A protein has these predicted regions:
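Short amphipathic alpha-helix used as the core "switch/output" element in two-component signaling
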Residues: 237, 259-270
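Non-catalytic signal-transmission and effector/linker regions of two-component phosphorelay proteins
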Residues: 170-200, 305-317
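Conserved acidic segment of CheY-like receiver
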Residues: 198-210, 214-218, 247
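Composition-driven recognition of glycine/serine/threonine/acidic- and proline-rich low-complexity segments
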Residues: 2-182
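Acidic catalytic/metal-coordinating carboxylates
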Residues: 231-234, 252, 256-260
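Active-site beta3 strand of CheY-like receiver
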Residues: 242-248
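Alpha4 helix (beta4-alpha4-beta5 surface) of REC/receiver domains from two-component response regulators
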Residues: 260, 281-296, 306-309
Length: 317
């Protein structure tokens, strides 16, 4: 595959999604530069990266790669957009890493979903964060070529998309994919009654940042009775004891994923509306959630501008 093909078919959707998510989550604008080939021996780790292994027509890694100062600036902007405040100490601490992970997961999840939907012969692993060269080591093994595209952000610096190529099917004929992935994977109801403002709503996410963001959005919408759970297993216990009227739940979590929690919840309660929120998923997970009776399935991000409108569209029974 040529550099042009690798860029247009594989990296371009990630770049599109990164710019769209950057704008949606932070209000910042950016633009992509021209692709070029990096020498493997000259590759330098810049301070923060989100990595996703890929197999199939190409064996390699998609890497979204930041200088630390850019990572801090973007992380602060994501925090500000989600919860209305940000860490100002200028260091890449746990809270900023969580904000960056949310943005990175959104980009990788939406781009890989879109590529897989077009059956191009690629499979992608869930993204992982690399904070130093030791974390990066496994991803660099066997890499023969690196395609790099710089992305410039207004007043924040730049980051890079790298495609680390271990092996590629040189005979593969691939057409570029230009559209951005669907926002709604299970659409909202077309009719019904809005959920009362005093209803008990449970928000489930293993990210404290997202729990805070959901609480902020729901509170601004007038909902006053909100409880949270930090993973799928605690959500099940909370459902048993508190019996919420409505649930918003993340899919990918540390101890028990949301689709597995949904299955167990449906054994307890077949009627409570449960809307799944995720940026990292696949068609099998979506179909499973449909079968289990999910009230909706939404692709993140949810930001201050559009988040309330999206949530309101599902808060109907």
């Amino acid at each position: 595959m040529s550099v042009e093909t690798l860029h247009k078919v594989i990296l371009h959707p990630f770049i599109q999604e990164s710019l769209a998510s950057l704008k949606a989550m932070t209000g910042l604008d950016g633009y992509a530069g021209d692709p070029f080939i990096d020498q493997v021996e000259d590759f330098r780790f810049k301070g923060y990266a989100v990595c996703s292994d890929m197999t199939g027509q190409l064996d390699g890694v998609v890497l979204m790669h930041h200088y630390e100062e850019t990572a801090v600036a973007v992380g602060q902007a994501v925090q500000q957009a989600l919860v209305g405040e940000c860490n100002i100490n200028g260091e890449l601490d746990e809270d900023l890493i969580a904000a960056l992970a949310e943005w990175g997961n959104t980009i990788v999840g939406r781009a890989t979903h879109m590529l897989q939907k077009h059956n191009l012969g690629f499979e992608f692993a869930s993204p992982h964060v690399a904070l130093d060269l030791q974390d990066m080591g496994p991803y660099l093994l066997g890499v023969k070529e690196i395609v790099t595209v710089p992305v410039h952000i207004e007043d924040a610096g730049r980051y890079y998309f790298n495609l680390l190529v271990r092996d590629a099917n040189q005979d593969a004929e691939l057409a570029p994919v230009d559209n951005i992935s669907d926002a709604y994977l299970i659409p909202p109801p077309t009719e019904g009654t809005p959920v009362p403002k005093d209803a008990l709503i449970m928000s489930v996410d293993d990210s404290s940042l997202i729990r805070r963001a959901m609480h902020r959005l729901l509170t601004e919408m007038g909902y006053t009775n909100i409880i949270t759970a930090d993973d799928g297993d605690s959500a099940i216990e909370t459902m048993k004891t508190h019996k919420p009227d409505f649930v918003f739940m993340d899919v990918v979590m540390k101890r028990l994923n949301g689709d597995d929690a949904l299955a167990q919840m449906r054994e307890l309660d077949a009627a409570t509306p449960i809307v799944m929120l995720s940026s990292v998923t696949d068609s099998n997970t979506i179909e499973r959630c449909k079968t289990l009776g999910a009230h909706g399935f939404v692709f993140k991000p949810l930001n201050a501008d559009s988040g309330k409108q999206v949530l309101a569209s599902y808060l109907v029974v």
